[in-house]
Amino acid sequence: MTIEWWQIALLTIYAGFSFYDGNNTTFGTVKPTMAGFFAGLILGDIQTGLIVGGTLNLLVLGVGNFGGASIPDYMTGALLGTAFAIESGKGAEFGVTLAIPIGLLMIQLDVLARFSNTYFQHRAEAYVEKGQFDKAGLMNLLGLIPQSLSRMLPVFLALVFGSVFVQGVVDYMPVWLM
């Protein structure tokens, strides 16, 4: 199966929205099971999506990012693992095998996204000191843009260039980075 451009677009948008959702509306789209289901729905194999997402959801149980700690992003792992499992026809086991290192790799991008978010937070603090609370709220929302992009860009690149690209990135990464 070849992943079509519209499927890449929907999965990329989902990756960005789910991060926003996890910090604001909390519809649950940030959960790996939901991400796997959505990817399976878009790509035509819901069962594989649920198996990949559900397996990754077991890894997330009891894990929280308290105090700003970065945790593996198994939502992105579920999206990409499901997509590659369906695309390759190798099954859910293959998808989970790819999804776990993808989730671990996303920790590093999460750190970069949080770092870039500090610009908006410093502006928000300045607006609060001036009593401009509406602008401070806007800065908090704008701070989600780099964080959403930290999910959207890897999903887009991985889906455009394929699982060989992702496996190559994971294989050439130093162990300390994971």
State what each model feature region is.
Residues 13, 52-59, 67-80, 84, ...:
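Alpha-helical membrane segments and immediately flanking helix-loop junctions
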Residues 18-23, 44, 60, 85, ...:
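Membrane-water interface at transmembrane helix exits
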Residues 1-71, 75:
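Hydrophobic transmembrane alpha-helices
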Residues 10-11, 15-18, 64, 76-116, ...:
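Short helix-perturbing small/polar motifs within transmembrane alpha-helices
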Residues 2-3, 24, 28, 44, ...:
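Juxtamembrane/transmembrane-helix boundary motifs in multi-pass membrane proteins
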Residues 1-8, 39-50, 84-99, 165-174:
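Helix-coil boundary and interhelical linker segments in multi-pass alpha-helical membrane proteins
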Residues 97-178:
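Helix-loop-helix junctions within the multi-pass membrane cores of secondary transporters/permeases
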